Amino acid sequence: MAKKRVYELAKELNTTSKRLMEKLEEINIVVKNHMSFLEEDELEALYDHIGVIRHKDDKSNTDDNKTASAHSVAQHSSEAMKELKKEAKKAPRIIRTTEIYLDSKDEEIKEIKANDAKSQKKPEEKRKKNDFVRVETETSGLRPGLVRETKPEYMRILEEQKKSEASKAQTNEKKDAEKNSVKEVVKKEEGSKQTAEIKDGSVNMEGKVLEEVKATVADSATNVNLNESIDKDKKTNDNRQVSTDNSAVNNEENAADTLNKKDMDKKNNNKKNEAKKNAEKKNEAKKNEKNDNKGGNAKKNEHRSPDMKKNDSNRPQDANKQNSKAAADKNREEGRTGSKKSLEIPKVELTTSQKEEFNSQRAERREYNKDAEKDSKRELRKEQPRSAISGGRNKNHKVIKNVFNSRKGVSEVLSDDFEMDDFYFGGSKKSRKIKKKKEEKKEEKPAPPKPVVTSIKIAAPITVKELAEALKKTSAEVIKKLMSLGIMATLNQELDFDTAAIVADEFGVKAEEEVVVNEEDILFDDSDDPNDPEAVPRPPVVVVMGHVDHGKTSLLDAIKKTNVTEKEAGGITQHIGAYMVKINNRNITFLDTPGHEAFTAMRARGAQVTDIAVLVVAADDGVMPQTIEAINHAKAANVTIIVAINKIDKPTANPEKVKQELTEYGLIPEEWGGDTIFVEVSAKKGVNIDYLLEMILLAADMLELKANPNKQAKGTVIEAKLDKDKGPVATVLVQRGTLCVGDSIIVGTTTGRIRAMTDDKGHRIKKAGPSTPVEILGLHEVPEAGETFYVITDEKTAKQLIEKRKLKQREQLLKASARVTLDDLFNQIKEGKVKELNIIVKADVQGSVEALKQSLEKLSNDEVRVKIIHGGVGSVTETDVTLAQVSNAIIIGFNVRPPANVIDAAKKAGVDLRLYTIIYNAIEDIEAAMKGMLEPTYKEVVIGHVEIRQIFKVSGVGTVGGGYVTDGKITRNANIRLVRDGIVVHEGKLGSLKRFKDDVREVAEGYECGLSIEKFNDIKEGDVVEVYVMEEVKE
């Protein structure tokens, strides 16, 4: 195979070069243009791809293969079949319905052209255009030796069937022609004989029946012989003899017709005689019909000819059509062929005399109708509304095509009454009277009274939805009632018992509070009986409150005569301390709450567990904001307040001014007619300390403080922390009962068994009575400060309660998490784009964590919002660093020292880790960080002016102005304004700044320079360039 160019190959294949190049690209063969050569392997690949089949000139080989394959097919040997399969794989297969031959001058193709030219019109014109294209033939694409059948097997079968049907039709036509010829001959020969017999009147009704039976037998025999004679084309004389018998029957019919005409004339003349003989003829007709039905039908069916059987198929089979034509013709024939007396047959009402022909389906239907009537009669006996419907049925029943014209219940549809009445008998077409009776019966039934709610039991709190369900009202009705009462409530809003009782009363329902027994009621005994005979006096719990640096801890130090203040960092109390002081053989428990505003929550908890509050006010400072807050907390907790005016030893002290200021807040001294005890003390010098203690004991006696030490122990957690060696440690104040080592307690969401107890002086104790502060060990987790603890005995119920509390706490955390909800979306829109400062707080005790949280959250402003994403007790861990890295937060450690690996991890992650021992420093640093996050405020500062005196145009640079610095200085990359005649022409930046040929950073006043402006060339002599910078304004 020689090389070929693309355009040459395109001509041979009768296509375009572009199309060929596209086909070559499909098989990854790239050619430059239509003049490129194609190698032999490329041609082979292209032929295989586009379906071109090349045939060789060796015909002998193909002939040998054909003969060999044909011989192998004839033998059907296994070895030959294997060889055929191998050859079939190698043989060329047709890819398209048109084969393309490149060797168009071969003799074989010429022969094919000659053969095709005979069958096609104008073959010369088509072959001149493309001689190499040949249409698919019988042998194309097949194995050698095999020929494709032009007509499949099923086509042959269809043609054979058509041929056989055509031959049958021809034979039938011959039969009919021969029959007609035979009948005409027989009619002429036998016509006279038949008429003579009829005139004599010797044939009676019974003889007629016998003759008809003989005639049917003879007719069937003649048909059989006639078919044989037509098939064999012999014995024509015999066929004529047999056909005479067949024609006799037809001749009798014609004679009967002529006789019928004569009889009709006689009937018209003798009508009077007919009326007399009606009764006798009726009886004869009945007898004949009975004989016909009993014996005649069976014999006729057995000996009927094929033509008669064909006619039977067209007869109506419905027995209900009693006046059918077949029955009437039958009666006429019986009358015509009888005796003279019986020939005068009157018109008989066949509808009453003739019986129904037997039919098995009709008999079943008749039995079914009888059963239905019996069922209806049974239903009439029952006292049911359906009985009236079944009794009014119509006997002419019809099946209803569409039964979906009325609604029925499932029980009614599945009942037998529906199937009988509605489906078969047309239950939808009931009489109006029945419907009226049914409606009257329905109206007679009394409607059941609606349940009226008179009283309900509800548990407080209850949601609006639950209240509506209890009242059997809709939620909308309950909400409307609440709105009329001035309460705007939603569907899931909780209502207290009093509000729910008022709403129920508005609906005329009496509400009773349901007693709900939960795990807390089982575990805890919260009943406090003031007249308990086992109650004994207990020490008072005193809390010292006041402003920062007013001397609270110094007063406690003076009372305890121990130096506590020096131990605190910066001299400020950081934790709640609980101490017991013995005065005159009586104990007093002191709680020292920090005075800083950050510890508001801690101070609120301290006020809740105390009996007396000592308000410390400095004589020189007077009432401060934290002092007012302390007064409010004490009043909210209903605590007796004793005012201690401290620092009276100072020369600037003014106790009277302090008393005057406190009267504004409801604290009036006794000497001024009030009920508040005022004591002037000096904690530093110990002045009037004993008198203050006596006043505390006096107030305690007035309160008559008692507690039952034998009850279930109950108390409050004052402080809790996580100790490295001891684990979770909690400082608790026992308020009731006696706490012992080994008791199991439950605090919030944690439990534990007390392993050890120590008092305020560090001594190990085994029991702690009411109003005793102790430090306990053995809890599983660090509890929250302010939680109430109980001693429990049923640990199983306690675990269930803890699971409930944890679930509730988890729900609250999910609600508090910053997720976008429909309720919170409006608030976020109002806030706009708010920057957040994420902070992680770690402290040594829980109280400090809460104090830092509240202090830092108060620093939030309109542009920056402080968000405490995590707060916990203990040192900073690597987990905290990871959380800070992910959430872009800073870590604040208070009184904790992180290990070296945590500090390294924070440095690698770029997390800001800050450690503090005094809370003021932490707050100040956070404020500075927040100011850094605010968008800075800039102001414009003019640093100099340049007067343009000469202009130079430099290729590649543009216009350069030579100027003189009149004042200030000019710096590179500074902002400039080009002023021309007092009008700002352009604002931009300096592109370059030079002095002579050197680039300089700045040019001072009194020097010349050359400058260019970025993206601006319209500089003219006399312009003034104003140079300025933007400086940040510190807040």
Swiss-Prot record:
Biased composition (Basic and acidic residues): 56-66, 114-137, 146-200, 229-238, 259-315, 327-347, 354-385
Biased composition, class Polar residues, residue ranges: 68-78, 219-228, 239-253, 316-325
Annotated region (G1), positions in chain: 546-553
Region ranges (G5): 682-684
Ranges for region Disordered: 56-80, 114-402
Keywords: Cytoplasm, GTP-binding, Initiation factor, Nucleotide-binding, Protein biosynthesis
PROSITE patterns xrefs: G_TR_2, IF2
Keyword RNA-binding: no
SUPFAM superfamilies in the cross-refs: Initiation factor IF2/eIF5b, domain 3, P-loop containing nucleoside triphosphate hydrolases, Translation proteins
InterPro entries for this protein: EF-G-like_DII, EFTu-like_2, IF2_II, IF2_N, P-loop_NTPase, Small_GTP-bd, T_Tr_GTP-bd_dom, TF_IF2_bacterial-like
Ligand binding (GTP): 546-553, 592-596, 646-649
CDD domains in the cross-refs: IF2_eIF5B (cd01887), IF2_mtIF2_II (cd03702), mtIF2_IVc (cd03692)
Main localisation: cytoplasm
Localisation per UniProt entry: Cytoplasm
Gene3D superfamilies, A to Z: 1.10.10.2480, P-loop containing nucleotide triphosphate hydrolases (3.40.50.300), Translation factors (2.40.30.10), Translation initiation factor IF- 2, domain 3 (3.40.50.10050)
Region annotation G3: where it falls in the sequence: 592-595
GO molecular-function term, one example from the UniProt record: translation initiation factor activity
GO cellular component: cytosol
Region (G4): 646-649
Residues annotated as signal peptide: none
Residues annotated as domain tr-type G: 537-706
Segments for region (G2): 571-575
Family to which the UniProt record says this protein belongs: Belongs to the TRAFAC class translation factor GTPase superfamily. Classic translation factor GTPase family. IF-2 subfamily.
Biological role stated in the UniProt entry: One of the essential components for the initiation of protein synthesis. Protects formylmethionyl-tRNA from spontaneous hydrolysis and promotes its binding to the 30S ribosomal subunits. Also involved in the hydrolysis of GTP during the formation of the 70S ribosomal complex.
Protein name, UniProt field: Translation initiation factor IF-2
